[in-house]
Regions:
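Long, highly charged amphipathic alpha-helices
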Residues: 18-22, 113
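Conserved short strand/loop->alpha-helix "switch" segment adjacent to the catalytic nucleotide/phosphoryl-transfer site
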Residues: 21-45, 100-101
């Protein structure tokens, strides 16, 4: 069982299938299934999409590196693009009803609530999502569900106001 694995993908959304296969193989090796698997696939896929579209500006001459690293308390997936990076703190909170309805920020929000820790490095060129497998429990699951419900509820309110 390898502790670290890497895949380098072309900066094209069609590479999503290779990414999901990479994640599936890792999850199979480590017996990770059910809802936690869905959290991993959704958040890592969203980070990949952001890297293709926003980081590399759909330039298929560029690559995206996906690293899998095992730590003592879980593991991380880190997605690195070849773009200029971005300031994570400038992304609007999509759950704040005072923010105008925008398409941006929702993916980062999903990456954040579906992982146990989201961190941006490399001036925003690398997004790392940590999953604390040792800490899978009802409390953590309830916290995620409540955040998602609050987001969905605020989105429904905003939609009904228009």
């Amino acid at each position: 069982m390898n502790k670290n694995e890497r895949i380098i993908l072309n900066s094209h959304l069609a590479e999503q299938n290779k990414l999901v296969g990479f994640i599936e193989n890792i999850c199979d090796q480590h017996n990770i299934y059910n809802s936690y698997y869905a959290n991993i696939v959704t958040s890592v896929s969203e980070a990949f999409d952001n890297a293709v579209i926003h980081g590399n500006n759909n330039d298929d001459e560029k690559n995206i590196i996906v690293d899998f690293v095992i730590q003592n308390d879980g593991f991380s997936f880190c997605i690195t693009d070849q773009g200029n990076g971005f300031d994570f703190s400038s992304v609007a909170d999509p759950t704040d009803i005072n923010n105008p309805i925008e398409e941006t920020g929702r993916g980062i929000f999903l990456m954040d609530i579906l992982s146990d820790k989201l961190e941006f490095k490399n001036n925003g060129r690398t997004a790392c999502m940590k999953f604390l497998i040792a800490n899978i429990n009802k409390e953590a699951a309830d916290k995620r569900v409540n955040k998602l419900k609050a987001y969905m509820h605020s989105d429904i309110k905003q939609t009904s106001l228009n």
